């Protein structure tokens, strides 16, 4: 009842949008326990997603960022009030007054909830200086982030916090707030548990290490939860493009029984054969959520450094092949400039019909380590520029 009164008062208040946003977020964080908040957000998300798909069935397979912007959110909730509860109806009404849509609000709530647990303090050491020097950083593999006692800070919030919270906050800011990958909101728990690769800046004086990059590492034993095998990423809409030398490289790596993977003609067929024939299951993993911090130039540097450290750490850990999903042109242009056997696509798809291709592919860790062994950031950027220029010339030739 107290929440209803607060929401009613806030709804009628003519506060500036930014102020109303902050008051609403604070109210929700104070009112709900973490698990209660998650259940509420998931319920309303599912309700509105199903409703929007019913209204626009031709967009059923699009991403949440497309689906939730098919209709003005305020118009949606006025024309189709929630039937979940009176509380949900009033909450959505206030959200509609100050946020683009429900998922935008969910993301901002999760970011604020973490920052509220670890508020910035006055008289703290200044924010860490992020150098463009490889030796200032180190990569590591953490088996269970939920169990580690390691406390770190991140560049956007220089306050000590558990590693799992730092990874989650970084994922929220880069992928959800920045790239609008709202599907991750209901899967935030994956950022808080399990095996993760991290890149840390060595601590200076008494400050804690700074997390500048991370990635989720999932073993073959949990392949049923892999994004690579989710229906959206393994269907007939995908263009199959696994190269002939990929089959040879897999045979050389001794991954299968029989030793040679059967020739395939579609991505779903390839996925099925891979599962049936794989015998060295310890050699395979999926790498997702490669997250980097900092401003635009720092992110490019940490993207280079994270890949360099990632390949080395996973190769040393005994992995041979890593499934991955990539949209990042900077990464793809570099891969075009190195040995083709170091990274190869298995398929590509324009998921949202917006001209942007998403690629499923494989990192061959042994070959990737070799590719990065004699290259620094300057050489990395030079290779990317040359690859981009070469690609542009090739496109011009086909016009």
Swiss-Prot record:
Keyword field contains Flavoprotein: no
According to the record, the segments passing through the membrane are: none
| Keyword annotations of the record | Autoinducer synthesis, Quorum sensing, S-adenosyl-L-methionine, Transferase
Q: Which top EC class applies here?
A: transferase
Question: Might you give the EC number(s) for this enzyme?
Answer: 2.3.1.184
Please name the GO terms of the biological process aspect recorded for this protein, alphabetically: quorum sensing
Question: Which InterPro entries does the record cross-reference, listed alphabetically?
Answer: AHL_synthase
The entry assigns this protein to a family as follows: Belongs to the LuxM / VanM family.
One of the record's GO molecular function terms: N-acyl homoserine lactone synthase activity
Name of the protein this chain belongs to? Acyl-homoserine-lactone synthase LuxM
Reactions listed under catalytic activity: a fatty acyl-[ACP] + S-adenosyl-L-methionine = an N-acyl-L-homoserine lactone + S-methyl-5'-thioadenosine + holo-[ACP] + H(+)
């Amino acid at each position: 009842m107290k929440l209803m009164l607060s929401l009613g008062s806030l709804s009628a208040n003519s506060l500036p949008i930014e102020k109303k946003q902050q008051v609403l977020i604070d109210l929700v964080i104070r009112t709900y326990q973490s698990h209660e908040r998650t259940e509420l957000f998931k319920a309303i998300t599912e309700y509105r997603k199903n409703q929007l798909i019913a209204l626009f069935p031709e967009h059923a397979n699009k991403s949440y960022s497309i689906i939730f912007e098919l209709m003005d959110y305020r118009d949606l909730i006025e024309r189709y009030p929630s039937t979940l509860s009176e509380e949900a109806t009033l909450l959505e009404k206030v959200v509609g007054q100050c946020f683009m849509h429900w998922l935008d609000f969910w993301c901002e709530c999760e970011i604020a909830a973490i920052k509220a647990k670890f508020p910035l303090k006055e008289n703290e050491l200044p924010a860490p200086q992020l150098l463009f020097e490889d030796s200032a950083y180190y990569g590591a593999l953490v088996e269970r982030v939920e169990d580690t006692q390691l406390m770190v800070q991140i560049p956007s919030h220089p306050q000590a916090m558990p590693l799992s919270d730092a990874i989650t906050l970084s994922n929220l800011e880069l992928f959800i707030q920045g790239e609008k990958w709202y599907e991750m909101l209901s899967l935030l728990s994956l950022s808080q548990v399990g095996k993760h690769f991290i890149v840390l800046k060595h601590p200076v004086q008494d400050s804690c290490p700074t997390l500048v990059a991370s990635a989720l590492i999932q073993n073959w034993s949990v392949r049923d939860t892999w994004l690579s095998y989710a229906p959206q990423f393994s269907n007939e809409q995908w263009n199959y493009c696994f190269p002939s030398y990929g089959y040879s490289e897999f045979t050389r790596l001794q991954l299968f029984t029989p030793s040679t993977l059967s020739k395939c003609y579609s991505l779903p067929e390839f996925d099925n054969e891979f599962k049936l024939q794989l015998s060295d299951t310890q050699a395979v993993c999926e790498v997702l959520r490669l997250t980097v911090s900092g401003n635009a130039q720092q992110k490019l540097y940490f993207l280079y450094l994270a890949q360099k450290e990632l390949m080395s750490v996973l190769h040393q850990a005994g992995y041979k092949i890593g499934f991955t999903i990539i949209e990042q042109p900077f990464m793809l242009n570099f891969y075009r400039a190195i040995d083709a056997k170091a990274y190869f696509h298995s398929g590509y798809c324009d998921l949202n019909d917006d001209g942007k291709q998403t690629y499923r592919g494989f990192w061959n860790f042994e070959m990737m380590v070799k590719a990065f062994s004699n290259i620094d950031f300057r050489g990395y950027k030079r290779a990317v520029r040359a690859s981009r220029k070469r690609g542009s010339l090739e496109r011009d030739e086909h016009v």
